[in-house]
Amino acid sequence: MTTGGKNTFYIHTFGCQMNQADSATITSLLQQAGYVAAESEDRAGIILLNTCAVRENAVDRIEHYLQHLQGLKKRDKRLIVGILGCIPQHQREEMFATSPAIDLLAGPDTYRTLPQLIEQARSGAKPFSLDFNVAETYEGIDPVRQGSISAFVPVMRGCNNMCAYCVVPFTRGRERSHPFRAVMGEVQKLVASGYSEITLLGQNVNSYDDPEQGVNFAALLDAVSCAAPQARVRFTTSHPKDISGELVRTIANRPNICNHIHLPVQSGSTATLGRMNRGHTIEEYLEKIALIRSLLPGVTLSTDIIAGFCGEQEEDHQASLELLSTLRFDSAYMFYYSTRPGTFAARTLVDDVPEVVKKRRLQEIIDLQNTISGELFQQAIGSVVEVLAESESKRSAEQLMGRTPGNRAVVFDREGYRPGDLVRVLITAATSATLTGRPV
């Protein structure tokens, strides 16, 4: 049984950094309405799941968790359970039927209505608010963040790219950029609060545009870098079509902009990219990588790869392996394709690659990328890197964990340092995912 009062709430956040940023906004909205954040779900009268619909396994995780919440509601009938984010936006008709535990639904553009939805749910209704609002950027809301070292700052919401496999345009709507002055106001608050790292967020972050101020993403990134000279500045996620010489030169010219770019490619086959509606060829992607590496010596690159997309032949898969071998990304998010209802692929393409083949191809991709990552990380042994300490290591309270400007995870001996410190670390060992060292 939960022990919190009826106006206490707890948010479980699933999925991407944008969801984490949204949860900070939701917390602020609810606190302004008189609700109190609980430290754990067993101390909350309201439990909210901020969900992700990008992949099938993410949806499965939510459905499994709802079984747990149904058990809690049987013991405490006053408990309110809300499903927020991308899943209800995408699957409204199915959501209430999924579990009797669900009391309310809210989509990414309607979090301002949560106080009213909660009160309606208490009266026995099953309310939902899932309208798209192309004007909603949650301007004027001060997010309530967890921690005081790294902060996510959404600069745009939604996506116009309509990749065939992707549900984001159907869950987060059309692109809309936050006003330049609002972004800079948020950054200035973070600087005044002493944050050490600021990450600019968007589903398609480098298509940012504030036409009233004449500010594109390169100009925004430059302005943020100048406004926060003592902080590291990052951004994610980029689309290859929006990588420009202006943007890369901005990164090169500003020492506090991290020397790391996450640039999803999804497949090494131009034919597969065409079916995916990615809007570029492999040759064009390679040109972008060449531009980046020519202007940013030592840059670390990461990517996304999907195995087994509709119509993928063995030669397409081999092209993906060849691409990984050629470009040698530092790391990659690797998945096999799962159909998302409502997408172009679900409506018009045939999911014709057998699951056993998808899994085999994915494993080959993972094995190759792990080998490449391991080789790259081994090359770092003996070097000294600057690490922003983020937290205690999961291994030991005598160690801290942090990241390099290139986004490599480093575990190092504590030696009196604290989270938030910038530490020069001599790398003494490496795996394919983590560097280990000692302060110097």
UniProtKB/Swiss-Prot annotation:
Cofactor: [4Fe-4S] cluster
GO MF annotation terms: 4 iron, 4 sulfur cluster binding; metal ion binding; N6-isopentenyladenosine methylthiotransferase activity
Membrane-spanning parts: none
Annotated TRAM domain residues: 378-440
Co-factor note (free text): Binds 2 [4Fe-4S] clusters. One cluster is coordinated with 3 cysteines and an exchangeable S-adenosyl-L-methionine.
Domain MTTase N-terminal: 7-123
Domain Radical SAM core, residue spans: 145-375
GO cellular component, one term: cytosol
Binding residues for [4Fe-4S] cluster 1: 16, 52, 86
Stated role: Catalyzes the methylthiolation of N6-(dimethylallyl)adenosine (i(6)A), leading to the formation of 2-methylthio-N6-(dimethylallyl)adenosine (ms(2)i(6)A) at position 37 in tRNAs that read codons beginning with uridine.
HAMAP family in alphabetical order: tRNA_metthiotr_MiaB
UniProt xrefs under NCBIfam families: miaB-methiolase, MiaB/RimO family radical SAM methylthiotransferase
Record-linked PANTHER family: CDK5 REGULATORY SUBUNIT-ASSOCIATED PROTEIN 1, MITOCHONDRIAL TRNA METHYLTHIOTRANSFERASE CDK5RAP1
Oligomer status and interactors: Monomer.
Name of this protein: tRNA-2-methylthio-N(6)-dimethylallyladenosine synthase
Source lineage: Bacteria, Pseudomonadati, Chlorobiota, Chlorobiia, Chlorobiales
Chain's gene name: miaB
